[in-house]
Amino acid sequence: MPTVVDVLLEQHLSPQWRGLLRALAAEFAAQLDREELRQLMFRVGERFAAEHPLPACESTEALAAALNARWASIQWGCVELADEGDYLRIVHYGAPLPAFGGDALAWTPAFLQGSYQAWLDAMGASDLTVVQAGVPEDGYAVEFHLARATA
């Protein structure tokens, strides 16, 4: 039985891209190990962020609004930000990462990670690091933490 994520993906991913994305992911996985794939997707995310800069934001609320406007413009879900004291929690919902196939969920979220890192660096948070908090089970919700890098 299809999951909610499967249904949403089916509705929002053009059929012309499904086979290509899965074949691309399979070929990437055949040529690169998991860490290399994460590094590649992180760099792709950085490039995406550089090509789609955010406006200056003076608050967490303004940042969330800018991020959500950016993701909504390409139908890539939405984000929630929460100040947890020693880190900023970033939860991204509804990115079409499952389009690459279930096995790719181990490395495709690095695209989001690289995007968030680049945007936050551009806003002056270059002394902080975006890290992924676990591997998403279904790819619908991906959590990241923005915090000081640990040695």
Task: Kindly label every feature range from the protein language model.
Residues 1-89, 95-107, 139-141, 150-151:
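N-terminal accessory segment detector
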Residues 129-148:
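Beta-rich nucleic-acid/ligand-interaction surfaces
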